[in-house]
Amino acid sequence: MGRVVIWVTIIIVLFPVLWIVMSSFSAGDSFFLSSLFPKKFSIEHYTSLFQETNFMLWTWNSVKLCLIVAAIQLAMTSLAAYAFSRLRFTGRKYGLMSLLVLQVFPSSMAVAGYYILIYEFGLVDSNAALIFVLAGGSAYNIWLLKSYIDGLPKELDEAAMVDGATHFQVFRKIILPLAAPQLAVIFLFSFIATYSEYVITSIFLQ
């Protein structure tokens, strides 16, 4: 019974995707036909897409921006998560609570403030401004990675420090390799979130 439910769920999820894919190969006047498989296969939509638009350039610009934002977020997230997990400093508790509280408010609430700041610096309609805005939203990822680092044995850190390693060396040579799976997940989350962002992108890139 469990497998039946799984297969039914898979079919329900994949059917719209299959419909869109098959519709893309239909002639221009047969998109809304009730049949799943078009009566006449055509690649005219793809021909029009690649020959009449700058689709590849648009895609490359989006991917490039997403890679840059994801890399910046990963660097900031990993450093912050290590600091909150392994170091004890003044304001640590309040910093963690602030990150948690920030998750309550949608990022759209800060758009007006961001725009005023970007406008004052004369960076409106620039990739630098968009990267600055999108790379900052990593509070959830910091909590996610901190929880993962908390589960790593502290004895490894202590053994390395006994041998003379600094905190940064412990972070780079021990924590990062052990946290590689979680780092990959965070990079993927950041990439997808940036690629899916429309409102902020449309505001800062006019």
Q: Which residues make up each language-model segment?
A:
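A structural signal for multi-pass alpha-helical bundles of membrane permease subunits
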Residues: 2-206
